[in-house]
Amino acid sequence: MGTNLSVPNPLGFFPDHQLDPAFKANSENPDWDLNPHKDNWPDAHKVGVGAFGPGFTPPHGGLLGWSPQAQGILTSVPAAPPPASTNRQSGRQPTPLSPPLRDTHPQAMQWNSTTFHQTLQDPRVRALYFPAGGSSSGTVSPAQNTVSAISSILSKTGDPVPNMENIASGLLGPLLVLQAGFFLLTKILTIPQSLDSWWTSLNFLGGTPVCLGQNSQSQISSHSPTCCPPICPGYRWMCLRRFIIFLCILLLCLIFLLVLLDYQGMLPVCPLIPGSSTTSTGPCKTCTTPAQGTSMFPSCCCTKPMDGNCTCIPIPSSWAFAKYLWEWASVRFSWLSLLVPFVQWFVGLSPTVWLSVIWMMWYWGPSLYNILSPFMPLLPIFFCLWVYI
């Protein structure tokens, strides 16, 4: 029949055909169906799908034969089930039986109660079972190598797992500081605008501030002088006001830092020579002696009087710069020295001072609050500098 190409039979009668005359069946050439040397074509019994059109199989009875395929009868042969798998590796394997202890650990069979007690007398082994100083029989001395034995065990097992609670608490502090810093930054950025509003309100007492830069020719709608657009003629004045406000804020911070350093005694300013308006500029100016201990600031200033001898004047441990300014102002303005007794008397009357402060706060408090409210965000920063410096 030829080579089997595994192609479905489109006509449906090979090899179950009965057209014996066509194949000249005789005694020498028997019927093809009975020929033992015929080519077993496994797909010959399968009628090609759509060979004669969609869903049409012509009747082949009589002319093409009487087989089920020739008659147009399609029989479905059930597929043979797959052979049973003998591979047990796909599922969960049963736990194999444990071999005897004498085969897996032959050295364990050599231990007995005497050998165990003898080994237990070793201080390194005993330290693992009994605390230092403890004993089961009372005859064994305390272990001496407890720390080394435990350290050797820790070196094998690794470091302990870090405590997550400590890690969380360590991260919580920086996060809170970051949040507080961001909050203060947003508040500090509002200081220039608030001061600008206060500045412009001085020109419109009792009225609503309106930008004076707009005119009838401009197409700009009415707006506040603190929110001028770039095309407004008052925009340059708004920028100038805010620049001056930034300089004032910077100067205020520097003054506070200077006062703080002076209060801490970190400004070693030499005082004035008694009876003079200036400090000495001679060679003795450089002979300052360091302070006691490890401080980097000098403890005294050497001045050169008229007789040529050096005189050491101690530097105040606190408010050195303030005292220097007061001495300098007292020399320049002699009438300031007359205020010292009055100030000392006024400070000594503590009830009077407190009543005066209360009265001034009650009378000028609301207006002072409106003036000082923009500077409120700076107070936490000043407090932190005062505490940590």
UniProtKB/Swiss-Prot annotation:
Localization of this protein: Virion membrane
Name of the featured protein: Large envelope protein
GO cellular component: membrane; viral envelope; virion membrane
Source organism of the structure: Hepatitis B virus genotype B1 subtype adw (isolate Japan/pJDW233/1988)
Subunit structure: Interacts (via its myristoylated pre-S1 region) with the host SLC10A1/NTCP; this interaction is essential for viral entry.
Record bears the keyword Ion transport: no
Keyword annotations: Acetylation, Caveolin-mediated endocytosis of virus by host, Fusion of virus membrane with host endosomal membrane, Fusion of virus membrane with host membrane, Glycoprotein, Host-virus interaction, Lipoprotein, Membrane, Myristate, Transmembrane, Transmembrane helix, Viral attachment to host cell, Viral envelope protein, Viral penetration into host cytoplasm, Virion, Virus endocytosis by host, Virus entry into host cell
Family membership noted in the UniProt record: Belongs to the orthohepadnavirus major surface antigen family.
Gene from which the chain derives: S
Region (Disordered): 73-107
Glycosylation site positions: N309
N-myristoyl glycine lipid sites: G2
Main location: virion
Region (Pre-S): 2-163
Residues in the Intravirion compartment per record: 2-242, 192-242, 359-364
Stretches that traverse the bilayer: 171-191, 243-263, 338-358, 365-387
